[in-house]
């Protein structure tokens, strides 16, 4: 069932079960800043893309090596890391953590003496997508993805095909965000927010273990979408009240 990210997922976020021991040693060992490890780390990223896995700290380790060894930077790897971070969470820090370790695209290309402008075009575009995702403007997000802009075309034809199921990854994190706020939502709204044809929305609901009632999708309780009234009691001591009244006199 798709729900908002729970604390139980934090360990998997930090140390995913799919991470091989040798990669774990490279990330956390004394050899973590050795640039000769880059080929192994980049191969690990390629496995992430192919298998639909995600290892934020493994990807950050690659960006850290690029930071210390800018001449080894690979623009395609950078873009794929940003795509993985973008597709991992709506409200988490993943994308910004990756972004903070990168300089301007033009500076990166200058260091590696590359004339390929894809990084210059796509990186700001991914930042735009992240802003739309972060602010839950899901319909506009899909409009950007499906647009005829140069950046969108490069993303769709050159990079997304390298990933196992990127569009469904976006749909899953959007569904998690929706599930944290709604108990019931219309299928037509869900179709727009998830960019799914109206006749396929029911299939998606089944995939994420939601039920369909008439023209609505019904989302089970998950601890965040079942708002309950509560009473907060404050125990204010006389001494505290005296200080408050005295402060109000100024």
From Swiss-Prot:
Its primary localisation, in coarse terms, equals: cytoplasm
Is Iron among the key words of this record?
no
PROSITE patterns for this protein: PCI
Keyword annotations of the record: Cytoplasm, Initiation factor, Protein biosynthesis
- Kindly list the cysteine pairs connected by disulfide bridges: none
Q: Which HAMAP family match?
A: eIF3k
State the protein's purpose: Component of the eukaryotic translation initiation factor 3 (eIF-3) complex, which is involved in protein synthesis of a specialized repertoire of mRNAs and, together with other initiation factors, stimulates binding of mRNA and methionyl-tRNAi to the 40S ribosome. The eIF-3 complex specifically targets and initiates translation of a subset of mRNAs involved in cell proliferation.
Assembly notes: Component of the eukaryotic translation initiation factor 3 (eIF-3) complex.
**What protein name is recorded for this chain?**
Eukaryotic translation initiation factor 3 subunit K
The opening ranks of the lineage are: Eukaryota, Fungi, Dikarya, Basidiomycota, Agaricomycotina
